[in-house]
């Protein structure tokens, strides 16, 4: 990948009007090196083969509903596995609310969590755009 594709996370947050759910985590030096996004549905089931943890990770209705179907303990373990995999950040779309325990876990793992009011597909399209010559 050439260096021009990377973008500061803070620029993406500003451009996409993301609400920072973990403001105590400093994102000023965080760069997104892969101009793509990922919906970690398979990873939330425990499948991490071929997982590209350099991508911005998105939680939409499908992932959120799946996680809500799990027990609190299982849900925490799935988030722990995802947040421990050194992802740059996690974005909840459609105004979905991350649970307080998950926010605490994110702070512990130093993985910022954001919230977007946009539909998941719209967010994905715009998120991919910042890596395709459209500056964030």
At which residue positions do the language-model features occur?
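Gly/Thr-rich phosphate-binding loop signature of adenosyl cofactor/nucleotide-binding cores
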Residues: 1-82
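Feature captures the catalytic cores and cofactor-binding loops of soluble hydro-lyases/lyases
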Residues: 49-58, 62-135
């Amino acid at each position: 990948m050439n260096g021009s594709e990377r973008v500061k996370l803070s620029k993406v947050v500003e451009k996409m009007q993301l609400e920072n759910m973990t403001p105590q985590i400093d994102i000023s030096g965080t760069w997104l090196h892969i101009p793509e996004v990922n919906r970690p549905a398979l990873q939330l089931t425990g499948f991490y083969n071929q997982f590209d943890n350099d991508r911005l990770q998105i939680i939409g209705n499908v992932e959120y509903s799946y996680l809500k179907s799990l027990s609190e303990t299982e849900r925490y373990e799935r988030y722990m596995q995802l947040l421990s995999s050194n992802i740059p950040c996690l974005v909840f779309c459609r105004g979905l609310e991350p649970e307080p325990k998950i926010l605490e876990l994110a702070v512990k793992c130093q993985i910022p969590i954001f919230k977007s009011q946009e539909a998941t597909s719209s967010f994905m399209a715009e998120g991919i755009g910042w890596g395709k010559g459209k500056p964030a």
